[in-house]
């Protein structure tokens, strides 16, 4: 899980086009809040926090310098500016409160995750750093054949050219798996009776 600082950086990483109409960004703001609410209801605290921070950055930093907010020309632009100002008065304070609550939840989960990870990484007391565990191989294991196969793959990896001819006995031997059943594709086995 990411920390609140990492999520803030991620939230502020988006492209803002000042030439796009203000009404499109207002619709984007509504969509961001809807998605953040859905994420919060689904208990995806990190995503909800990131979306709310992106919403706040868009409303309070990016859109405040938008041309249609600064100098609206048409009636439609004035209407969009009024909607933006209403958004700042009514929604932004509520989203700020939600974001602060989510920030503490995100940081708490992040710290718990780090502590849990630290516990799982630290070796248990009394265990050697390089303890070995004996593994019992099956009786069908052929160590000589295994070593030949490993050597073949090492040689093939160095030359970067694997032999592809099925006629070569070494290749046939490497790619035959005796422990797997052999399937017969004879025509008589598929004929209807």
Swiss-Prot record:
Keyword annotations from UniProtKB, A to Z: Endosome, Protease inhibitor, Thiol protease inhibitor
One of the record's GO cellular component terms: endosome
Domain of life: Eukaryota
Coiled coil, from the record: none
GO biological process: ubiquitin recycling
MF GO annotations: cysteine-type endopeptidase inhibitor activity
Subcellular location, record wording: Endosome
Disulfide bonds: none
Chief location: other
Family stated for the protein in its record: Belongs to the RFU1 family.
Its job: Inhibitor of the DOA4 deubiquitinase involved in the regulation of protein degradation by the proteasome and maintenance of a normal level of free ubiquitin.
Protein's name according to its UniProt entry: Regulator of free ubiquitin chains 1
Gene (name only): RFU1
């Amino acid at each position: 899980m990411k920390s609140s600082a990492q999520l803030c950086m991620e939230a502020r990483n988006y492209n803002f086009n000042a030439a796009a109409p203000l009404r499109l960004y207002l619709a984007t703001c509504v969509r961001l809040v809807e998605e953040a609410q859905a994420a919060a209801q689904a208990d995806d605290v990190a995503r909800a926090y990131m979306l709310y921070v992106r919403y706040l950055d868009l409303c309070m930093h990016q859109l405040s310098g938008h041309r249609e907010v600064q100098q609206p020309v048409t009636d439609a632009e004035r209407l969009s500016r009024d909607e933006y100002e209403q958004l700042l008065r009514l929604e932004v304070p509520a989203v700020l409160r939600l974001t602060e609550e989510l920030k503490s939840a995100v940081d708490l989960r992040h710290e718990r995750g780090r502590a849990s990870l630290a516990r799982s990484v630290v070796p248990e007391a009394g265990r050697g750093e390089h303890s070995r565990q004996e593994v019992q191989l099956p009786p069908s294991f052929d160590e000589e054949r295994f070593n030949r196969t490993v050597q073949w793959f090492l040689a093939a990896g160095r030359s970067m050219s694997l032999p592809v001819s099925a006629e070569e006995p070494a290749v046939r031997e490497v790619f035959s798996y005796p422990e797997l059943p052999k399937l017969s594709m004879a025509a008589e086995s598929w004929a209807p009776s």
